[in-house]
From Swiss-Prot:
This is Protein pelota homolog. Its EC number is 3.1.-.-. The lineage of its organism: Archaea, Methanobacteriati, Methanobacteriota, Thermococci, Thermococcales. The keyword Metal-binding applies. SMART domains: eRF1_1. It holds the Pfam family eRF1_1.
Length: 356
């Protein structure tokens, strides 16, 4: 993500989205009531002459819409913002009509808020910093099956699954040929994804020697790809193997601690403290009380709470926690750490001292 222009007095920040992760960050930055400006296409009736009926054409226009619905469509690589038009660069575009702005990687938008809160500014900074980090791919491979995932800011993005029917006994010529075809297919998928997604490292994981055979194959046939690969031992292949890689902290060894790993560890720490009746509070009532006492060391909030009915209350609590020198972490609902936090009410806090 790139910030192109800031107008603090008007509450405007002009941004260029560059990746799917950026769209995810924008989904959490843009709130209902914000005004979003962007170039777009809008269907307009065009009268060619008095004898012919009107024809509808998509004309380019710069619009400002007041956001009412914000939806992230990950598989389409799009963020869609719907609301009434409050500004149009063309006089023939009626104000008040509804329009949907589609934001994709490469789109430039301007966001206008009545007040930019610390949470939103921190999120912007985080998006900019994360765009500088290398992306990581995980490939879990086991006897004719490969699962491919990209480690994104919000969690794991499972982007491919390859299954090949490899028959016969080991060291059989037919089996070896089938295995090579499978390895070629996995390698080509990896190359294509790494180029498209600008991925610099891949972790190849799996049980036994199968992954080593695959990496040796890469060294012989795809030497440039092999240079970007590290291996990890897991008990299983498939998605289970990929989750195992995350839990083992292998991604963190490839580059600085990933967001998903940090969030999962933090939620696990909360659960550990609950189990021993330690320095922890969970659920809105308990966390609010702990914050008011100044007892919160780290406030942990599920991102979906910031899109629901409690948004304003949660944002106020986050601001209060920051003012009392607590750190605030927003956890993605897209991974298992988010699922566990949701079961605790979507909000928890690690404490400096007990309040009860």
């Amino acid at each position: 993500m790139e910030i192109l222009e800031e107008k603090p007095k008007e509450g405007k920040i002009k941004i260029k989205a560059e990746t799917l992760d950026d769209l995810w960050h924008l989904y959490h930055i843009i709130s209902e009531g914000d005004v979003v400006y962007a170039k777009t296409l809008r269907k307009q009736a065009q009268r060619s002459d008095s004898l012919r009926p009107e024809k509808v054409e998509a004309v380019p226009v710069f619009l400002g819409i007041k956001a009412e619905k914000i939806n992230l469509h990950r598989f389409a690589n799009q963020l869609r913002i719907t609301g009434p038009i409050i500004y149009a660069s063309r006089e023939d575009v009626p104000l008040g009509r509804y329009h949907t702005l589609t934001v994709e990687p490469g789109t430039v938008i301007t966001i206008q808020k009545e007040k930019w809160k610390n949470y939103h500014i921190e999120r912007l900074k985080e998006a900019i910093e994360s765009s500088k980090k290398a992306r990581v791919m995980i490939v879990a491979i086991e006897d004719g099956e490969a699962e491919i995932a990209i480690v994104r800011e919000y969690g794991l993005d499972f982007v491919g699954s390859i299954t090949y029917n490899i028959s016969g006994k080991r060291y059989n010529i037919k089996r070896d040929d089938e295995e090579k075809k499978f390895f070629h297919e996995v390698a080509k998928s990896m190359e294509e994804l790494m180029k498209r997604e600008n991925i610099e490292k891949a972790i190849v994981a799996g049980p036994g020697f199968y992954k080593e055979n695959f990496v040796n194959f890469l060294r012989e046939n795809y030497p440039e790809l092999a240079k970007k690969v590290v291996t990890d031992d897991t008990s299983m292949g498939g998605r289970t193997g990929i989750y195992e890689v995350i839990k083992r902290g292998t991604v963190d060894k490839v580059y600085t601690e990933s967001r998903i790993s940090k969030e999962i560890k933090l939620v696990e720490k909360v659960i550990e403290e609950i189990a021993k009746n330690g320095l922890v509070a969970y659920g809105l009532k308990e966390v609010e009380e702990a914050t008011n006492y100044g007892a919160v060391e780290t406030l942990i909030v599920l991102d979906s709470l910031l899109k629901g009915e409690l948004r304003e209350k949660i944002e106020e609590l986050m601001e209060l926690a920051r003012n009392l020198r607590a750190s605030v972490v927003v956890v993605s609902s897209e991974h298992e750490g988010g699922d566990k936090l949701k079961a605790l009410g979507g909000i928890a806090a690690l404490l400096r001292f007990k309040i009860k």
